[in-house]
């Protein structure tokens, strides 16, 4: 039934032309289906179509199979002095400059969110640089998502912030593993709470925290303690370590991702 599968995946890819992730995944699996039918022209066509979206998982796989060097640019173009002066001459720019000078990061984050409540591409792009410089990861992602909804093309680095937060007792796993879970679970929002009660950056359930944590402070406290970024990351890291040691997961990151959820 590979022929039928190829047709379904092809139609799936074409019907979702505005969703690059589904377009890439549909194209990739169409190519895989045609590979079973030895239809090399079709394989090449659909792999190339998937490769047009290199910032997606299946786009990267397609690039790798085709031997195409990833065109992803991780550099960020800095604004020139003229653009900077234009921004700082705005009332919102003046307020941000004042907050930076007196060192008030929380108020700075609030101001950036407020000034981007109405879309202005120039202001949003400048705000991104400020958010990245001050490691305001959640704010950075909110602006990125808003700009992308309006069709803006941004350097991919903006979509993957690296916050300053660390687990209370330091990293015992690769930091990138925790960054990935924070990105997916809470978009780096330390105050996030799901309808099921999962809390904070790593979306930890209070019951899981009390079960997994060796920290007496967490075992004795109410759920709001999980809004503390360092403690939340500490519990999340302990939970990931626990899962990785299970025989059913055996250090497999794909299985880990499924088990965490």
PLM features: residue spans?
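Duplex nucleic acid-engaging cores and interfaces of nucleic-acid transaction enzymes
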Residues: 13, 26
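Alpha-helical segment of the N-proximal tetratricopeptide repeat
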Residues: 90-114
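Structural signature of alpha-solenoid helical repeat scaffolds
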Residues: 18, 54, 83-84, 115
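Helix-turn-helix repeat elements of alpha-solenoid scaffolds
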Residues: 2-10, 66-72, 100-106, 154
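Catalytic glycan-binding domains that act on GlcNAc-containing polysaccharides
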Residues: 2-4, 18-25, 37-49, 60-63, ...
């Amino acid at each position: 039934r590979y022929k039928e599968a190829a047709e379904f995946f092809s139609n799936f890819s074409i019907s979702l032309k505005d969703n690059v992730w589904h377009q890439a995944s549909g194209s990739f699996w169409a190519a895989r289906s045609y590979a079973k039918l030895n239809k090399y022209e079709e394989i090449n066509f659909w792999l190339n179509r998937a490769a047009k979206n290199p910032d997606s998982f299946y786009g990267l796989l397609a690039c790798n199979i085709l031997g195409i060097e990833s065109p992803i640019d991780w550099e960020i173009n800095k604004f020139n002095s003229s653009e900077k002066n234009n921004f700082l001459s705005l009332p919102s720019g003046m307020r941000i400059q004042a907050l930076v000078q007196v060192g008030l990061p929380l108020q700075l984050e609030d101001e950036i969110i407020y000034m981007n409540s109405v879309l202005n591409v120039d202001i949003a792009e400048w705000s991104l640089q400020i958010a990245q410089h001050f490691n305001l990861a959640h704010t950075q992602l909110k602006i990125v998502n808003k700009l992308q909804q309006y069709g803006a093309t941004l350097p991919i680095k903006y979509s993957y912030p690296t916050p300053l937060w660390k687990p209370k007792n330091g990293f015992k796993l690769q930091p990138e593993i925790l960054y990935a879970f924070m990105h997916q679970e809470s978009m780096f929002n330390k105050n996030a709470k799901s309808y099921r009660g999962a809390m904070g950056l790593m979306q930890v359930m209070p019951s899981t925290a009390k079960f997994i944590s060796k920290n007496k402070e967490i075992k004795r406290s109410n759920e709001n303690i999980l809004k503390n970024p360092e403690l939340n990351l500490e519990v999340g890291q302990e939970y990931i370590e626990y899962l990785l040691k299970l025989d059913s997961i055996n250090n497999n990151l794909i299985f880990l991702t499924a088990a965490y959820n």
